[in-house]
Amino acid sequence: MSDYPAIPFPDELVHLEQVSARLSKALQRAEASVSRADREYTDTKKYMADHRGEIDPHEMFQNELLLKQTDRTGAFAVEMRDRIVKLKDSPYFARIDFKEEEEEEGQTYYIGRFAFQYENEPLIFDWRAPISSMFYDCEVGEAGFLAPAGWTAGELTRKRQFKIRNGIMEYALESSANVQDDVLQRELSHTSDEKMKSIISTIQKEQNQIIRNEKEGTLIIQGVAGSGKTSIALHRIAFLLYRFKDRLSARNVTILSPNKVFGDYISGVIPELGEEPIYEMSFGELADIQLEGVIGFEPDRDPFEMQDRAWEERVRFKSTLDFVYMMDQYIEQMPEFIFVPTDYVYEGFRVTGEWIRDRFLAYGTCPVKKRLAMVADDIHDRFETDNIMEQEVPRPRVILKQLNSMLAMKDTLAVYKDFYKRMGIAEQFVMAARRTLEWADVYPFLYLHAAFRGLKESHITRHLVIDEMQDYTPIQYAALNRMFPCQKTILGDYGQYINPNHLHCLEDLRTIYDKARFVELNKSYRSTYEIMCFAKKINHVSALEPMERHGEPPELVPCLDAADEIRKIREVIRRFRAGGNVSLGIILKTDAAARDMYEVLAGYDGVEENQVEENQVEGNGEEACDISLLTRESTSFQNGISITSVRMSKGLEFDEVLIPQADSRTYASDFDRSLLYIACTRAMHRLTLTYSGKETEFISGQPPFL
């Protein structure tokens, strides 16, 4: 990759100076607005406090309105100030010159993170604006863009790309396909960050088309490791918030992520793009909300730490699409056996069981409990109509109590048990403990709970993002569709599944979301060409296209025994500390193995080498201080050295990755092949694998290093 020369366009330096000067003036005005709003708010509060007993109710009401207005004005001023501060650091990253058809002269547009105008003159256009799409989609020549008013055609006469940092232009280039590729490689060669960053200056054409897709109710993205699918989904949300700002806000979007560490890792992207933070939660937290006061459940178990064949079979059984069909069949038949009413008599009033049943069946789209409430209202209304003698009529809640007594099953747990018994599969349901479900039963239970009692639907959430789609079962998606009847962006990679007991595939998702648009991303950007070619051979991902960013080949480090492997691991750690990279991920196959490795590497403070057991050799307290363990209980991701399992590393990236125990015992099955692939593809710049004994067959034939 070439180093960029001095700025070849003097006019761009002049323009940047002019824009920076106007941003400085705008910042002064914004800060003055913030100070004025703060002062007005404080003065009004003081006046109300000083004259509390003297102000009449009308004046008090007016002052409260003034406080609310001042608060809104101040919040807007703070938002504008913060945006200008960010723009001063990097005002824009691109310029396009565009001449519309039948226009004699073209216009120049600078594209940045936010729009900025000074005294009604637009100086910077938001990257999400319709005209900005030409920077991502078009080369110099015939071009156009789709605006709300329709298609605008013309000619793109110039396209430039910039890197501005701390208000200083580092490079300016006439943009072309080759230059864009060079810029992308330059950006990808940087070290990793503790949080995912926006990619607005390097969005690729195929990515831009997904981001700006506003037509699809549900969009499903199948993307290989490192294809940027999570970042694309977040930028798509930012685009939709911009495009539909009148009816969609950040509080209307929910992200379902695999764990808190990943949620923290992606949490900065949306705010970086000028939007409010998005609400993020896990499948477990969602189940907690739905089942509070109903029933308890155990957390998802690590399948590698379970040695229970019956449990594995139960998990497999409930992970299939056929299981959803079986539950649907039961739900369809449920009205026939769950409610067999008798005549209802109250003093001189009477309705037959047949009439009650007809009314019950008429409300077929509603949960059983809601149907009964509606039938109770119908009975009450009928009694009121027939009440010629003006006798006392039973209230709906009295009628409902009687109708509930006619139910064959009183709660969802009884219904859930009946499902397995009636379907002849009673052995597939085992309680984890008293009134505690196994994790595999949680979403099937919720699915029946929706049919029997009803779920808490989210009317606030208007767009749901589901990441790591391959880790969730068809019944989980079926239950989610009941909870969130809204548009969805679903993303993941079926080449990176982490549960060997899940028996579902991408085609099952196509069946569940038969009207969704499916897109595939096969180009990988995260890792060097050498790392991705290495990973591609492990998992035979033929569709994967590595980015041509070259680096060192992966290192395979043979070790004499476990103690020697620990010594070699510490050598890798010392090399990392002496280098310029900022993050090293040490990725073990299981949570238990990660905990053990953490105890070995971080728990040997002050131990002399001759006092150490075979599996704990040499070290000092200074080495251990920057090592952290990432578990399901962790809440944040930080630079330094992180020890974790494959399942916890998904979605994360590290400058360097070290994979210990890459031997034939640890990575032996086809599923292990997938896990090793996931671990390898977390590395951006450097990958090292250590092993004692025989190396796993998935990496055999590669030359050893170190």
Per-range role (PLM):
Residues 246-247, 251, 260-276, 281-288, ...:
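Conserved helicase motor core of SF1/SF2 NTP-dependent helicases
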Residues 92-98, 440-449, 584-587:
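Short, hydrophobic/proline-enriched secondary-structure or compact coil segments at domain edges
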Residues 95-97, 220, 255, 688-691:
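A structural signal for short, well-ordered beta-strand segments and their strand-loop junctions
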Residues 226-229, 467, 651:
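Conserved phosphate-binding and hydrolysis motifs of nucleotide-dependent enzymes
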Residues 1-200, 204, 208-212, 696, ...:
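Extended, charged low-complexity regulatory segments
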Residues 241-464, 471-479, 487, 495:
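Alpha-helical nucleic-acid-binding subdomain
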